[in-house]
């Protein structure tokens, strides 16, 4: 795959105000704007990178977290290769809503095998001192819901932002490798010469 670029669609989901737009902008442009408005509908940015020898274009989709925008965002779930479920560590309700976001994504993205779909969990706004969700709580949720990787991030100071998105790519590549292996084990070699018949007439 080296030398050839793949396009991966990665979608950020979570309550409004948890910092999804800021995470996307920090990762793609390395900028932080505290005055960002809530996303209406969806928007996306592209980022080219190399992960473990694989050249990848990440198409990162940011979605509106408010309930009233559900009909605008859900049509864009289809075709996603990875979902970054995002909450804010200073907002316990956004953490409690992770399960609802996961269910919404699986339904509208029409995920055929939810158990193997690559989710990555982000606990954002770690720069805020007054936490409502502990690291241990978040790690326990990840373990109980699919053994998902968990990153505590800050779009403001860029903590773990690049690491989280790169892990998303690794998860996608691992999923693709598994499916390619399954396909290869079921194929028949049409170019293999038949063994000569050793029986005599």
Swiss-Prot record:
Keywords of this entry: Acetylation, Cell membrane, Cytoplasmic vesicle, Endoplasmic reticulum, Endosome, Golgi apparatus, GTP-binding, Hydrolase, Lipoprotein, Magnesium, Membrane, Metal-binding, Nucleotide-binding, Phosphoprotein, Prenylation, Protein transport, Transport
Name of a matching Pfam family: Ras
Residue numbers of Phosphoserine PTMs: 34, 179
Swiss-Prot/TrEMBL catalytic activity: GTP + H2O = GDP + phosphate + H(+)
Example GO biological process: positive regulation of exocytosis
InterPro entries noted in UniProt: P-loop_NTPase, Rab9, Small_GTP-bd, Small_GTPase
Main localization (coarse): membrane
Bilayer topology term: Lipid-anchor
Enzyme class: hydrolase
Quaternary assembly: Interacts (preferentially in its GTP-bound form) with GCC2 (via its GRIP domain). Interacts (GTP-bound form) with SGSM1; the GDP-bound form has much lower affinity for SGSM1. Interacts with SGSM2. The GTP-bound form but not the GDP-bound form interacts with HPS4. The GTP-bound form but not the GDP-bound form interacts with BLOC-3 complex (heterodimer of HPS1 and HPS4) but does not interact with HPS1 alone. Interacts (GTP-bound form) with NDE1; two RAB9A-GTP molecules lie on the opposite sides of the NDE1 homodimer; the interaction leads to RAB9A-dynein motor tethering.
Family per record: Belongs to the small GTPase superfamily. Rab family.
Name of the protein described by the UniProt record: Ras-related protein Rab-9A
Organism of origin: Mus musculus
Gene: Rab9a
């Amino acid at each position: 795959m080296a030398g050839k670029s793949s396009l991966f669609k990665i979608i950020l989901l979570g309550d409004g105000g948890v910092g999804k737009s800021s995470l996307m902008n920090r990762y793609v442009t390395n900028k932080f704007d505290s005055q960002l408005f809530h996303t209406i509908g969806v928007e996306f940015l592209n980022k080219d990178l190399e992960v473990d020898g694989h050249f990848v274009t990440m198409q990162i989709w940011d979605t509106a977290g408010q309930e009233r925008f559900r009909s605008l965002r859900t049509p864009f779930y289809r075709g996603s290769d990875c979902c970054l479920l995002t909450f804010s560590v200073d907002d316990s309700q956004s953490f409690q809503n992770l399960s609802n976001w996961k269910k919404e994504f699986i339904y509208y993205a029409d995920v055929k095998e939810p158990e193997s779909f690559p989710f990555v969990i982000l606990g954002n706004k770690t720069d805020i001192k007054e936490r409502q969700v502990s690291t241990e709580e978040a790690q326990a949720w990840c373990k109980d819901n699919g053994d998902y990787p968990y990153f505590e991030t800050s779009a403001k100071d860029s903590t773990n932002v690049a690491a989280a998105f790169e892990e998303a790519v690794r998860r996608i590549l691992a999923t693709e490798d598994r499916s390619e292996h399954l396909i290869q084990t079921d194929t028949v070699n049409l170019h293999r010469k038949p063994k000569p018949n050793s029986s005599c007439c």
